[in-house]
Structures are given as C-alpha cells and as structure tokens.
Amino acid sequence: MTHRTKTRPVKVGNLTIGGNNELIIQSMTTTKTHDVEATVAEIKRLEEAGCQVVRVAVPDERAANAIADIKKQINIPLVADIHFDYRLALKAIEGGIDKVRINPGNIGRRHKVEAVVNAAKERGIPIRIGVNAGSLERHILEKYGYPTADGMVESALHHIKILEDLDFHDIIVSMKASDVNLAIEAYEKAARAFDYPLHLGITESGTLFAGTVKSAAGLGAILSKGIGNTLRISLSADPVEEVKVARELLKSFGLASNAATLISCPTCGRIEIDLISIANEVEEYISTLQVPIKVAVLGCAVNGPGEAREADIGIAGARGEGLLFRKGQVVRKVPEEIMVEELKKEIDVIAAEMAAEREKEKETQEQ
C-alpha cells in the first residue's frame, strides 16, 4: 500500500497537503469570478458545508483583479485556475492567491513559466500541475496512440521537471480522466513515480446521481490503496453537493475526523414510523457538524439498539414511541411526536462535548 504520510508536505494557505493521512476536501465555484459578491456568497456556502480549499476560474483580467477582494472575505485557501495566459497567474499571485493551478505545457515559452514560478516562489505559493487525459500533449498522443496512464505520468514528470529545473518543489499533481479505470491506473503509477502530493478527481463525471456513483467507484478504489492527499468530486450540480459527497466518501474510509455520520436501516414491512423522512431530516441536521459523531435512525425497536451499538446516539422507532439509545444502551423511551426533537437535543450535547474535548487536546499539544 502507498502511504499518504510518505508524500512531500506542501503548504496551501494555513493548511498542509501531503505528509500526513488527512485528505483535504476541495471544490470549485460556478460563479463568474469577477462578480465578487456572488463568488464570495457561494464560497461561504461551501465553507459551511465543509469545503477546505476552493478554486476559482481566472479566464481574464477582470477575474484576476477580483482575487484580492475575494480573499479578504473568505476563511479558506483560494486557488486560481489558469490556462494559457501566464500574466493572469502573475496577477492572481499579486492579489494574494494561495495556490495556482496551471498546465506548464499550455502557459507558453520557458520565460513565461519561469516568471510564474519565480513569483510563486517569492510568495511561498504552491503550484498544482493539472494533467488531464483529454488534453495531453501532441507528442505524447503520437507516442502512445491515445490517452494512457503511462502517457499521463510521462506528461506529469515532464512538467515536474520544468519546475524542478527552476528549483521549485512546492508542487501538487492531479491525474484526471473521465474514464474510471484509466484514472485509477494513472494515480497508481503516479504514486510510484514521485512523492509530490496527489490531488484526486474523476473529471467530467456527470450529474449529481451518475457523477456521485462514478466518482465513488474511481476515487474509492484509489483511496483504498492509500493514495491521495486532497480531492474534488466533480459534478454537474451545486458545488455544495460536491462537498457533501466528498465528506461521505472520506467517512466510508475512516478518513474524515471532522464529519458526522448517519446510520439508518433499509426499510421493511416491520417499520411503523416514517423512517425515510426522519432519516433525511436528521442527515440534514448533522450535515454541517465538524465532529465525528455517529447518529443512528432505525425503524425497529426490537433489534435496533443492538444493531447500531457503535452509534454515539440514536433512535429506534415503534408505533407511538421510540427508544433513545447511546452506544447500544437504551437511555429512555420518548413519545413518537417528539422523538426527533429529543434526538437533536442529545446530538447537540454530544457534539458540544466532542468539540470541547478536541479543543482541550489541541491546547495540550500546543503546550
């Protein structure tokens, strides 16, 4: 297994990507970047959902000039997505951007790449090399005949060398493809070829439903091998949904220490409460919690508490009443009409306890 802790740590704003087992969740805005008010509003929504790094498109000078104003109003690192015009990268860096995403191959002649690298080095800003199966260099396509994992790695190594030759090493690399099997193979080979942090993603994955399934299949396979330091779920949907899916995916692998988990049973003929709507309501309620609380919503009062004994708190419904339980032990019976509200109160108490405990641990570590 490849271990994330063996990758080179790279600072992005106040975060470190690589060098540890934490995976950073990213997303990208859908607004016109020059519309500062709309862009900041969307980023605030992403922050609330749990996004840790956000990328904005910088297609023109208006967008580049907006970077400084956006930076002042947000709390997470900001990444500039640059194509073709190196001057936009320079303007974004001047505006206080935290990371630049470029493809050195389409920035132009060496002196242009050198100008971007020197500006980034001066400000301590990392560069993400974005390799994409759909836009590989002509000579690589001619060599391999079509996009291959080997071709993608060769492209990455070529671009890495351009930066390394300029004595620049604050590099993050992505190896994106819309073909799941190609992406898996490319990331596996990249993890063996260099120790720079890897940004995971399945590009052009599709709509909310199809894209979620496709991304989970591809990124799940990659994550299971211990590969990846940051990720974005790319969906043709509200970017907040990207963050929600990313958090759920990381939770599935035990890689999200700051997210709540819902356990709910499949419906069957024994259920006598509106389990589906209750589960959805509770899921929405815990979606923004930044603690690793496990909450269970079960429809059977006979087996429920025992089946979800790993849950910190939960309810098991029956006709007219429900059982409130903690760690598999029944705490009390509650009337059905206030069952969900009582559960929410218990969730708030446990979440506050967990947050206080984490703060205490943090203070101890800093002493």
Swiss-Prot record:
One Gene Ontology MF term: 4 iron, 4 sulfur cluster binding
Record bears the keyword Transit peptide: no
Cofactor binding note of this UniProt entry: Binds 1 [4Fe-4S] cluster.
Keywords: 4Fe-4S, Iron, Iron-sulfur, Isoprene biosynthesis, Metal-binding, Oxidoreductase
This protein's pathway: Isoprenoid biosynthesis; isopentenyl diphosphate biosynthesis via DXP pathway; isopentenyl diphosphate from 1-deoxy-D-xylulose 5-phosphate: step 5/6
Pfam family, one: GcpE
Catalysed reaction equations from the record: (2E)-4-hydroxy-3-methylbut-2-enyl diphosphate + oxidized [flavodoxin] + H2O + 2 H(+) = 2-C-methyl-D-erythritol 2,4-cyclic diphosphate + reduced [flavodoxin]
GO terms for biological process, alphabetical: isopentenyl diphosphate biosynthetic process, methylerythritol 4-phosphate pathway; terpenoid biosynthetic process
EC number(s) per entry: 1.17.7.3
Coiled coil: none
EC top class, as a word: oxidoreductase
InterPro entries membership: Dihydropteroate_synth-like_sf, IspG_bac, IspG_bac-typ, NO2/SO3_Rdtase_4Fe4S_sf
Cofactor section: [4Fe-4S] cluster
Chain residues that bind [4Fe-4S] cluster: C265, C268, C300, E307
PANTHER family, sorted: 4-HYDROXY-3-METHYLBUT-2-EN-1-YL DIPHOSPHATE SYNTHASE (PTHR30454), 4-HYDROXY-3-METHYLBUT-2-EN-1-YL DIPHOSPHATE SYNTHASE (FERREDOXIN), CHLOROPLASTIC (PTHR30454:SF0)
Family from the record: Belongs to the IspG family.
Biological function: Converts 2C-methyl-D-erythritol 2,4-cyclodiphosphate (ME-2,4cPP) into 1-hydroxy-2-methyl-2-(E)-butenyl 4-diphosphate.
Protein name according to UniProt: 4-hydroxy-3-methylbut-2-en-1-yl diphosphate synthase (flavodoxin)
Gene designation: ispG
